[in-house]
Regions:
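Short, conserved phosphate/pyrophosphate- and ester-handling motifs at nucleotide-, phospho-/glycolipid
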Residues: 16, 72, 209
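N-terminal glycine/serine-rich phosphate-binding loop of ATP-dependent small-molecule kinases
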Residues: 1-65, 77, 81, 120, ...
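Short, solvent-exposed coil/turn elements at secondary-structure transition points
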Residues: 1-4, 180-183, 315, 335, ...
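Active-site core segments that coordinate phosphate-bearing ligands/cofactors
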Residues: 76, 80-140, 145, 150-161, ...
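Extracytoplasmic ligand-binding clamshell segments of periplasmic binding protein
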Residues: 173, 179, 210
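Signature tryptophan residues that serve as conserved aromatic anchors
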Residues: 12, 20-21, 70, 109, ...
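Short beta-strand-loop/turn "lid" adjacent to the catalytic site in phosphate-handling enzymes
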Residues: 33-70, 95-101, 132-153, 176-179, ...
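Alpha-helix termination/capping residues and helix-transition junctions
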Residues: 36-39, 48, 171, 219, ...
């Protein structure tokens, strides 16, 4: 089951870091028990985590408040104000992004709105940094983490202290930086009691969920693209170009094989309202499983007999210029349409969101040679995957792997030793390929209708 997200105000989204740790401990114990391995066979730990969240701890490492997570919209105005004050050119050349609604802006929001909490901060962290800290007792972060928080200066190849100074944030709050692939600390006796892991196991790898997902799918070179359709949807394209016309709708982050000499960047387009839309339908229409919903959707023709769903009900959408338009159910005829129509319209609406986003990437000169996805989310749906493949006229390769498997495999890699993980994936994990359908016309018509509805709503927001 997905973890709950608290929303104390409209547009806010929070989770308790202690809950992450509690569930990490439960899951680790369960993996050890169900896999029937001896704990002393475990040689290292890899961490994949939800990106952009802000974790604040005191000197004892205790969280000072719930984490303000990736889909929280409270810092949109903070980021927009900083973008205006700093200027487009500096943000473009040094950050490759606008400050946006990311971790640095969220930290500034805390400084302005929760000064008593801000005064107690010893370090800020990303979610994966917090899990690594709980495992090792050491507080550090990575270039990945700082770049996803819009705190990395690509020109000087160091922490963007000038941005933190602009926000009035003390430089001492930034953790030390370690490499993605490095010895980042070892488990201790307390961790052994909580997780069942022996003391002395090193944490060797750490990356945010999207660069890690790309690594898991052997998406490491320019032209290779990883897609995922979980709670949020993501298109993650690797490039070596340190430039972008899009500083807000698309975001550029350090990839796992980035170096100052080999500037591999992940251009990320995020759709907050993705799998969460399908989950909402499942929970509120009483379906027993996603498989049942997929079967119901298959009973309905392309275009859902006119029903249109815009799935943007999970906070401000960056690809919509940080507008929070909410989810929309349109053209529903109470005498004609059924829950099956809503299932199909939801799958199509999410698929159309991907197509809309990929169009933005292509307009930004993003090269797309191959697209790969794991077999553990919406890309398991033939309706969803075929709709995307048909409208972008591109094959989508599906592999039986997950981010957790990729993070585990990454433990055995050394920096630069990426060929081995790619070879293993291609030889062992391939499932199938979704190819563009020959009869594109009904898909183009349905997408055109969806896009028209979206544009009308955007004009009024």
């Amino acid at each position: 089951n997905e973890m709950d997200i608290a929303s104390p105000q409209a547009g806010w989204a929070e989770q308790d870091p202690e809950d992450w740790w509690k569930y990490a401990c439960l899951a680790t114990r369960r993996v050890i028990q169900e896999s029937a391995i001896f704990p002393d066979q475990i040689k290292g730990i890899g961490i994949s985590y939800q990106m952009h969240g802000l974790v604040l701890v005191d000197k004892g490492g205790n969280p000072l408040r719930k984490s303000i997570i990736w889909c929280d919209s409270r810092a949109v105005e903070t980021g927009e104000k900083a973008f205006e004050e700093i200027g487009v050119e500096r943000c473009k050349k040094q950050l490759l992004n606008s400050p946006g609604n990311f971790t640095a802006s969220k930290l500034k929001w805390v400084k302005d709105n929760e000064p008593d909490i801000y005064k107690q901060i010893y370090k800020f962290m990303l979610p994966g940094d917090y899990i690594a800290f709980k495992l090792t007792g050491e507080i550090n972060t990575t270039r990945n983490g700082l770049s996803e928080g819009i705190m990395w200066d690509y020109k000087s190849n160091e922490v963007a202290d000038w941005l933190l100074e602009h926000f009035g944030i003390d430089r001492s709050l930034t953790p030390d930086v370690v490499e993605n692939f490095s010895r980042q600390g070892i488990t201790n006796d307390q961790v052994s009691k909580e997780t069942g892991l022996p003391a002395g196991i090193p944490v060797i790898y750490r990356a945010g969920d999207q660069p890690n997902n790309a690594l898991s799918l052997n998406v490491l070179k320019p032209g290779e693209v990883a897609v995922s359709g979980g709670t949020s949807g993501v298109v993650y394209a690797v490039t070596d170009l340190l430039k972008s016309k899009e500083l807000s709708r698309i975001n550029s982050f350090v990839h796992v094989n980035y170096s100052h000499q080999q500037t591999h960047i992940g251009k990320l387009l995020c759709i907050n309202g993705c799998g969460i839309m399908y989950r909402w339908l499942r929970n509120h229409l009483g379906f027993g499983s996603y498989e049942e919903m997929n079967g119901k959707a298959a009973e309905i023709p392309v275009g859902s007999d006119g029903v249109v769903i815009l799935p943007f009900g999970n906070g401000a959408e960056r690809m919509l210029n940080n507008k929070d338009i909410g989810a929309h159910f349109l053209n529903v005829n109470l005498n004609q349409h059924t829950g099956s129509h809503l299932c199909r319209a939801a799958l199509e609406g999410i698929a159309f969101s991907f197509v809309y986003g990929i169009e933005i990437l292509k307009e930004d000169n993003t090269q797309i040679d191959v697209i790969r996805a794991g077999n553990d989310n919406l890309f398991r749906s033939e309706i969803f995957s075929s709709t995307v493949a048909t409208l972008i006229d591109q094959n989508i390769e599906i592999y039986s792997t997950t981010g957790s498997i990729g993070a585990a495999r990454a433990v055995s890699l050394k920096q630069g030793d990426f060929e081995r993980i790619g070879t293993f994936l291609m030889q062992n994990d391939y499932v199938n390929t979704y190819v563009p359908l020959e009869d594109k016309e009904p898909y183009l018509k349905a997408y055109g209708r969806w896009k028209e509805e979206l544009q009308m709503i955007l004009k009024n927001k």
